[in-house]
Structure formats: structure tokens, C-alpha cells
Amino acid sequence: MTNLEEIGARARAAGRRLALMPTERKNAALEAIAAALLDEANAAEVLAANADDVAAGRDAGLSPALIDRMTLTPQRLAAIAADTRTVAGLPDPVGERFDATVLENGLRVHKRRVPLGVVGVIYEARPNVTVDVAALCLKSGNAAILRGGKEITRSCAALTRLIQNALAQTGLPADAIQVIDNPDRALVEQLLRLDRYVDVIIPRGGAGLHRFCREKASIPVITGGIGVCHIYVDQAADLEMVVPIVHNAKVQRPSVCNALDTLLVHRAVAAEMLPAVARDLLASNVELRVDEEAMALLRAAGFDTPQIVPAQESDFGVEFMALILSIRVVAGLDEALEHIARFGDHSDAIITRDPATAEAFVQAVDSSAVFVNASTRFNDGGQLGLGAEIAISTQKLHARGPMALRELTSYKWVVEGDGHVRA
């Protein structure tokens, strides 16, 4: 029987110890985890557990895409090990001092960066998340309680044993990383209410998981990783820029959260831009769901294919996660901004050579990341120079956009005096 109170208490105690660990010790633990992933015996144990999960998934009729996401291979373990070593090489945010000042009364004041404490992470059928989250939490001084999808229970348990062994070998508390290996869904609800021990919940999965966590939690929940992504092609856009940016944003990895969902095109350039974009995307088997004006322009340009279909209004509020793109022709920047304000908050981009229009777009669009003449696919911790990420938050509190090491910390005020008393 899984006792979450015990797990929470052990995590809290381990987190207090971990918060005081020097960077060198934390890095040594991360290096030990990476080495363990590459060790033949350890890898064999993890792969055997994963093979059992995959076999059970196939028997349950899971989709090929889901089976692929949950499958580990020696090559994927090597990539996870490399990512863990990358985290070891990142700057440690814990203990950083900032906003230092000396007050008129002589008090010396600064803020000091500290871990959040205990992080609960609930995720779906991606066993690699087990190690990714563990690495980021360890480096930022946080304990973690992990709950992977029921499809990968064996894989998560095997990876957590490997991590805990590495922690013990390097003198860090093994309870800093724990997994709930019981697939009972009721335990997820219990975790969401474990506010005596857990400081924050980070869900990683689909819209249903995020909604469930928001509705059931008595703990702060940082949601994100879901949202409709837009590109607006301005009348001053460079056609040579438009086609490769749209292609990259839509085609490179259509199933991820920063992939393009809706293309908005200025009416003044739609007749020129749309055929070139459509020709490129159709060659990559993208289905285009277009409004009436876009359909007329594409028909006039000679396009007649079942891959181009009339858009429904509901197609403009959908995160497709597939080779599907909705397209709308707009009168200009104001209409594009109105559309994005209604549907966007994740990753939104403008393609234009006009600096004033670009700045107006950046100022007006209220999303976690806004791009000028660049693909939405760059809304990623690794791509934005953070090294790694635990999630992409679309909230405004506590963090926004890619959440990396610094976003897994808070701060405390430190006030130093010389016998000061308040008047």
C-alpha cells in the first residue's frame, strides 16, 4: 500500500538537506546518474522493465505514436544521460545574491535564491521525463515526488531506483527523488492535496491532465505546455522568410506544444504568399483548413486537392498536435492581434520587415513567448539558452515560458544590521 504521507515527509526532510548541498556534490550525483544510465547492467534492467510496459501497452491497444513515446532504447538512454550531464554543467542558481542595497539607516539588504522545496510532477507516457525532472530538481536543490502515467509504471520505478542508488553513492539523500509506482488514480488526487509537504505541482501532459490538476489541487499548480500557436504574415513580410519559417513551425515536430496551429495572412499579400506556403506544406502531407477568402485565392491559383478543406470556426481554437494547419486571411495587424488575443497564450510570431509593426506586435501579444521573424519552435528551454526545461508555463505566476533551473527557485530576503532596532 502506498502511503503518500510517508513519501511526503521523507521528501520534505530530504529537501531540507538537499537545499544545503554544495554545487559540486549535486553535480557529482548528476554525473553518477548519467554513468548509471550507460552502465550495461543498469541499462538492461531499465530496458527490461520498459519492454514489459511496451508489451502491456500493445496488448491494451495503445496507438503506435504512444508506444513510440513510451519506448526506451540504448540510444535513447544515451541521450538521456547526455542531457543529464548537460544539466550538471549549467550554473547553479541556488545561493545567488541579487538586488543588494544599503539602506539609509545602514541595513544591508539582498535577496538570495533558494529552492522551492518539494516539487510534485505528474506526467504521462514519457519515461524520459523521470530523469529529466530528477536532474533539474536535484541541481536546483529541490526534492521531487514523481507520478508517471500508468502505462510506464515499471519504467519509472526502474529509473527511480537507478537515480536513488546514484544519490546514495554520492552522499545525497536518496529520498530526494521518489516515485509513486502504484497506478491507482486516486493517489494522484491525494498528491494534489498533499499541501503539508508539497510546495508546487507541475503537470506535464494534455489539456485534460492540466484541467484535472487545477480543479483538484490544494497546492499551487503551474500549468502550460498547451495552447494554440500562431504566425502572422504581415504585408511587409519577406516571402523567402515565410515559407521556411512556416514549414519549420508546422512540419518539424507537429506533435509538440510549440508547433504552429494557425496561420494568419495579411490580405494585401495573401494572393502571393498563400500559394507558396500551400505548395510547400501539401508536399509534406499537411491538411489545410482554410477560411473562405483563403479558399478562393487557392482555387484561383489552381489548387484542387482534398488536403485543402473549408475551415470551421472551431478549427481556430485547436492545438492540433498533427499535420493540420488552419489558415485565415486578415485585414491587417489589428485583426491579427484580436484573433491571437482570443485564442493564443503560448507561442506567437510575426513575420515582417517593418520594425514598427514588429514592435507593436510584441507589445500587444500577451503570450509566454513572442517571436519576430523566427519559428515558434524556439519556445524551448534548450533553444533559448536555458540548457533544459521542466515545462513551458503559460501562466504569469510563478514563472512564464520555459521553466529551467532558475524558475525552480524562489528567494528570501536577507537583512544584515549592526544592532539595528526599529524606531
Swiss-Prot record:
It is an enzyme of class 1 (oxidoreductase). Gene3D superfamilies: Aldehyde Dehydrogenase, Chain A, domain 1 (3.40.605.10), Aldehyde Dehydrogenase, Chain A, domain 2 (3.40.309.10). This is Gamma-glutamyl phosphate reductase. Its main location: cytoplasm. It is found in: Cytoplasm. Its EC number is 1.2.1.41. Keywords: Amino-acid biosynthesis, Cytoplasm, NADP, Oxidoreductase, Proline biosynthesis. Belongs to the gamma-glutamyl phosphate reductase family. It holds the Pfam family Aldedh. Pathway: Amino-acid biosynthesis; L-proline biosynthesis; L-glutamate 5-semialdehyde from L-glutamate: step 2/2. GO terms for biological process: L-proline biosynthetic process. GO terms for cellular component: cytoplasm. InterPro entries: Ald_DH/histidinol_DH (IPR016161), Ald_DH_C (IPR016163), Ald_DH_N (IPR016162), Aldehyde_DH_dom (IPR015590), Glu-5-SA_DH (IPR012134), GPR_dom (IPR000965). It catalyses: L-glutamate 5-semialdehyde + phosphate + NADP(+) = L-glutamyl 5-phosphate + NADPH + H(+). Signal peptide: none annotated. The gene is proA. Catalyzes the NADPH-dependent reduction of L-glutamate 5-phosphate into L-glutamate 5-semialdehyde and phosphate. The product spontaneously undergoes cyclization to form 1-pyrroline-5-carboxylate. The keyword NAD does not apply. One of its GO terms (molecular function) is glutamate-5-semialdehyde dehydrogenase activity. The keyword Amino-acid biosynthesis applies.
